[in-house]
């Protein structure tokens, strides 16, 4: 093949993209509670070791593109759209008004707001630092985000304590820091109660998002399980208002099974929001789009969620690759991410109804015939052949993932 001129590259990518097929319409995509974050659509490709590869994108452009794709919901950090110096000013009110108008004009809803408490230099020691002035500022930021959330009609507020911890052990007294962090959440919840009453709206669902490491060396609430313990610790004045926003990749980063972490959140009644992406176990936070690394694991995750009635939100918290152009972000990256999720979601529905999996599962639950429930050898023998069904269920899920259950085969 000859080198492709720059003027012909978009048409080539577009032609090959259409040739892939399997796409859903914007109307079909809107049926799912999928949310598009401002930070993902506007990500320029920058990282600790990387310069940006894309041009800046405004929130107006991101929202318009999401509408065209069929992503029905939008989410943002406060400073994704409002410069830190303009917070708490009339400029903030003007920007929030523009956002509201843009969402309305494009038929989108704001589903979630979150506060940046990790990037600005004021948070160099974290949002629960020793200085009462830093903690007061952090609390004001959280309360301000709650206010913005109600102004935009959001349902959720997310908290990511990525800078809550320490670089140097011994410099921070952990139990005190946990109490200070709880004070910030308590301030946000109290403000929410008051602001919701003013707007005649329900209070927001406040969702904590865990991450085992990065950017802080040691994060004090590194896992979803740690956050469940924190919520139940007695430090929160309104624990009923606080739940979880697990992120798929954050669970993989510390070697966990995301499905098991989600199961524990479901059991606690605290799975309220879910950040979806993909990546590699025990690696850093690469934020690859859903289904590109672990599609079988994702199928199993969605089987669990569908089985327990969790239907969203599903927040596309990923970074379009640095190799993808500004055009490609919205022409290829986001549409294909949404379509992979929908396909996996519908596959999960098929798996739940699959007669082979259902009969195998029922048989395992029924167990074998045992005459003496205290005879360990008899119990072992009674289930010896039946337990082979575990592997067969795994094989059947593989067949569903590849469409083999519908008769697809390969000629060899």
Walk through the language-model features, giving the residues of each.
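Conserved beta-strand positions in the central sheet of alpha/beta enzyme cores
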Residues: 72-75, 112, 158, 275, ...
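Substrate-binding cleft and catalytic face of glycoside hydrolase catalytic domains
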Residues: 103-127, 157-168, 202, 212-213, ...
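An active-site-proximal structural segment forming one wall of the substrate-binding cleft
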Residues: 102, 130-156, 176-199
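Basic- and aromatic-lined ligand-binding clefts that recognize polyanionic substrates
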Residues: 198-231
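Histidine-acidic metal/acid-base catalytic patches
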Residues: 1-70, 170, 183-194, 219-412
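Surface-exposed, active-site-proximal loop segments in enzymatic domains
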Residues: 45-49, 80-94, 118-136, 163-176, ...
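Extended hydrophobic secondary-structure segments that form protein cores and membrane-embedded regions
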Residues: 158, 205-210, 243-249
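Glycine-rich, aromatic-flanked loop segments that form ligand/cofactor-binding clefts
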Residues: 19-41, 64-69, 78, 83-86, ...
